[in-house]
Amino acid sequence: MPEQVIELTAVRRDYPAEPPVRALDDVSLGVARGDYLAIVGPSGSGKSTLLNVLGLLDRPTSGSYRLDGIETTALRDGARTRLRGDRIGFVFQSFHLLAHRSVVENVMLAEIYGGHPRKGRRERALTALDRVGLSHRVNFLPDRLSGGERQRAAMARALMGGPSLLLCDEPTGNLDSRNTGAVLDLFDELREQGLTIVVITHEREVSTRAGRRVKITDGVLVEEA
């Protein structure tokens, strides 16, 4: 597999307005396999737009985006959807767990909606839950979990398809300091296992744990020391 998971080259994203709004301005970024990258920046800086482009939820106006060596910008919607389901896992600030479903059922839903084969689905979900240290909560409903455990369940769901890239949008925004630390420890473990992680955050505790940090301001990306 290619050494670079993410290769952005001169990416722009413009939105129609008067005058036009440039949310991303000639953004170039390379993220190698196994990297742990934090993206920081003020509100309205372009962080969410960048996440949407990286997650194949939005198309750049111009420029190139290669994911795992695949040029994505010219792909049709169906091909982009399949590539996203195969290569990208998402973790958000809100856990998006169904209250009436058990933890393992919530994790299994990732493959149901992704069109993956039914055979072995529960076993794969149990493996993902064990990977995030939640094997003792598989039959619990979400309301019996702590905030940190709910985020771990959401991370297990994101890991179900064996993604190359984990995209995290403010993953600790709803957690206290203890649960934040536990989630960050899990990120460290996943990185050691070779997973590529990109985290958008405004929390310094989160960004300082990453191996790399970039800042986006007015759509312009700058690498930080």
Roles of regions detected by a PLM:
Residues R213-A225:
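H-loop (His-switch) and adjacent beta-strand-loop-beta switch element
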Residues Q4-I216:
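ABC family nucleotide-binding domain
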Residues M1-E3, A225:
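Short, low-complexity, intrinsically disordered N-terminal peptides in bacterial proteins
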